[in-house]
Amino acid sequence: MYDYIKGKLSKITAKFIVVETAGLGYMIYVANPYSFSGYVNQEVTIYLHQVIRDDAHLLFGFHTENEKEIFLNLISVSGIGPTTALAIIAVDDNEGLVSAIDNSDIKYLTKFPKIGKKTAQQMILDLSGKFVEASGESATSRKVSSEQNSNLEEAMEALLALGYKATELKKVKAFFEGTNETVEQYIKSSLKMLMK
């Protein structure tokens, strides 16, 4: 099994990205492939989950370990496969999903692709209370998350002051959510994306 891959992002399609390392190109299915568009031909680190089937070995990739943990929780539910779990992650913020499960909000959960009432009920039964670690609810995690967000916000404000538009920065900010960098590192990495 693979935990993560580090290599050059060589290709982006509507469903997957390709990361090249040691002369091999790995096809990795991700929730929002175009969120990686600023990193083509640059080194990236993608967290992985491997699914082995009779007819294929598939890799699913994630921006952060938290996103991967949520995916793993989702596929543990009867009726939710990797593709459906990825679709859920693609159309929702993690907080909304966690809140819906913990509050038994079936109506909210059935808005997701391929999630009917029965599967939504199963999600609530199986996952209620299990997203605490993945969503960063411990005191330590909240503190770290707050510091990360503060640095990221400061970097975005600096880029706004440099003349970049909020619409341009929205995609950049989304890419770095959940990462842990200094203000200077965020600015430097963001500029690389914006200059592509």
Swiss-Prot record:
* Matches recorded under CDD domains: UBA_RuvA_C
Per UniProt, the keywords (alphabetical) are:
Cytoplasm, DNA damage, DNA recombination, DNA repair, DNA-binding
InterPro entries named among the record's database cross-references = DNA_helicase_Holl-junc_RuvA_I (IPR013849), Hlx-hairpin-Hlx_DNA-bd_motif (IPR003583), NA-bd_OB-fold (IPR012340), RuvA (IPR000085), RuvA_2-like (IPR010994), RuvA_C (IPR011114), RuvA_C_sf (IPR036267)
One GO molecular function term of this record is: four-way junction helicase activity
Heme listed as a keyword: no
Residues annotated as region Flexible linker? 143-148
Return the annotated region ranges for Domain II: 64-142
Q: Where in the cell is it found?
A: Cytoplasm
Q: Name one GO cellular component term.
A: Holliday junction helicase complex
Pfam families on file: HHH_5, RuvA_C, RuvA_N
Q: Where is this region: Domain I?
A: 1-63
GO biological process terms, alphabetically, are: DNA recombination; DNA repair
Q: What is its main location?
A: cytoplasm
User: Which region ranges are annotated with the description Domain III?
Assistant: 148-196
The yes or no answer to whether the keyword Glycoprotein is present is: no
The protein's job, in short, is:
The RuvA-RuvB-RuvC complex processes Holliday junction (HJ) DNA during genetic recombination and DNA repair, while the RuvA-RuvB complex plays an important role in the rescue of blocked DNA replication forks via replication fork reversal (RFR). RuvA specifically binds to HJ cruciform DNA, conferring on it an open structure. The RuvB hexamer acts as an ATP-dependent pump, pulling dsDNA into and through the RuvAB complex. HJ branch migration allows RuvC to scan DNA until it finds its consensus sequence, where it cleaves and resolves the cruciform DNA.
- Let me see what the UniProt entry remarks about domains: Has three domains with a flexible linker between the domains II and III and assumes an 'L' shape. Domain III is highly mobile and contacts RuvB.
Oligomer and partners: Homotetramer. Forms an RuvA(8)-RuvB(12)-Holliday junction (HJ) complex. HJ DNA is sandwiched between 2 RuvA tetramers; dsDNA enters through RuvA and exits via RuvB. An RuvB hexamer assembles on each DNA strand where it exits the tetramer. Each RuvB hexamer is contacted by two RuvA subunits (via domain III) on 2 adjacent RuvB subunits; this complex drives branch migration. In the full resolvosome a probable DNA-RuvA(4)-RuvB(12)-RuvC(2) complex forms which resolves the HJ.
Q: What HAMAP family does this protein's entry cite?
A: DNA_HJ_migration_RuvA (MF_00031)
Q: Which family does it belong to?
A: Belongs to the RuvA family.
Name of the protein this chain belongs to = Holliday junction branch migration complex subunit RuvA
